[in-house]
């Protein structure tokens, strides 16, 4: 089983090399990884293109033939050393999705957000967190079981050049179990221009009507002296007199 897991690291290196050159990665490789169909080195060799390996070997032979006689011995000795180091190297093992010990920095915001004139001791602690890689690009190593653990730290304040020690409690999050979960990415909502226009047409628009209000002035009243006079002719005579 360990040998099977060790096959994935060279395959990942190959995928990175292909993506760096600009060629699209075949979907069959991801399907085989997700179906756990790679069980031996023969299955891995079927996925890798042997033409690229042959081209690398031909290029190496061409460079060796073009070199001078003195450089030929040096390049051949380097090639032998590289082959010997490859033979002595141990097979790579995939980093499984599981809990590992990580270092967590205790920031001052976790203790007091209103004050920054203090120190925290210890400044960092160890926590258990999920890490590792999964077989498919659409899944990610995440925590399936979490436990909250309170710890006690020291809050050191400096007052009048003297340290004052206080106790504070910080809650840490430890991962107890991990598993590879599918990554859910929200799909962007695309709206056609015709749909937005139709919605605007259906939406009733509020119309603002401005009305002009005329203020009527009260009628001019007669002079108190001539209120009893109703005849216009007599009124003119009186005013004319």
Swiss-Prot record:
Cell compartment(s), UniProt: Secreted
Glycosylation sites per record: 63
Alphabetized GO MF terms: collagen binding; growth factor activity; platelet-derived growth factor receptor binding; protein homodimerization activity; superoxide-generating NADPH oxidase activator activity
Effect of deleting the gene: Perinatal lethality, due to severe hemorrhages shortly before birth. Kidney glomerular tufts do not form, apparently because of absence of mesangial cells. The heart and some large arteries are dilated in late-stage embryos. Mice lack microvascular pericytes, which normally form part of the capillary wall, and develop numerous capillary microaneurysms, leading to hemorrhages. Mice display erythroblastosis, macrocytic anemia, and thrombocytopenia.
Keyword annotations from UniProtKB, A to Z: Cleavage on pair of basic residues, Developmental protein, Disulfide bond, Glycoprotein, Growth factor, Mitogen, Proto-oncogene, Secreted, Signal
Any one cellular-component term (Gene Ontology): cytoplasm
Residues covered by region (Disordered): 217-241
Start-end of Basic residues biased regions: 217-230
Job description of the protein: Growth factor that plays an essential role in the regulation of embryonic development, cell proliferation, cell migration, survival and chemotaxis. Potent mitogen for cells of mesenchymal origin. Required for normal proliferation and recruitment of pericytes and vascular smooth muscle cells in the central nervous system, skin, lung, heart and placenta. Required for normal blood vessel development, and for normal development of kidney glomeruli. Plays an important role in wound healing. Signaling is modulated by the formation of heterodimers with PDGFA.
Protein name as catalogued: Platelet-derived growth factor subunit B
Taxonomic lineage from the root: Eukaryota, Metazoa, Chordata, Craniata, Vertebrata
């Amino acid at each position: 089983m360990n040998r099977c897991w060790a096959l994935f690291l060279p395959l990942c290196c190959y995928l990175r090399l292909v993506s760096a050159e600009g060629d699209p990665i075949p979907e069959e490789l991801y399907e085989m990884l997700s179906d756990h169909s790679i069980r031996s080195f023969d299955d891995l060799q079927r996925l890798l293109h042997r033409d690229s390996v042959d081209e690398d070997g031909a290029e190496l032979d061409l460079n060796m033939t073009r070199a001078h006689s003195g450089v030929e011995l040096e390049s051949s000795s380097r090639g032998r050393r590289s082959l010997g180091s490859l033979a002595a190297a141990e097979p790579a093992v995939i980093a499984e999705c599981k809990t590992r010990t990580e270092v967590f920095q205790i920031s001052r915001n976790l203790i007091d957000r209103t004050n920054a004139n203090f120190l925290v001791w210890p400044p960092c602690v160890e926590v258990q967190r999920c890490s590792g890689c999964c077989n498919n690009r659409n899944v990610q190593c995440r925590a399936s079981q979490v436990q909250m653990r309170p710890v006690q730290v020291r809050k050191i304040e400096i007052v009048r050049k003297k340290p004052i020690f206080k106790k504070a409690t910080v809650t840490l999050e430890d991962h107890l179990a991990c598993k590879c979960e599918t990554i859910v990415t929200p799909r962007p909502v695309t709206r056609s221009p015709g749909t937005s226009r139709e919605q605007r047409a259906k939406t009733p628009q509020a119309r603002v009507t401005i009305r002009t209000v005329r203020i009527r002035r009260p009628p001019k009243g007669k002079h108190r002296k001539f209120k009893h006079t109703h005849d216009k002719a007599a009124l003119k005579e009186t005013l004319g007199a």
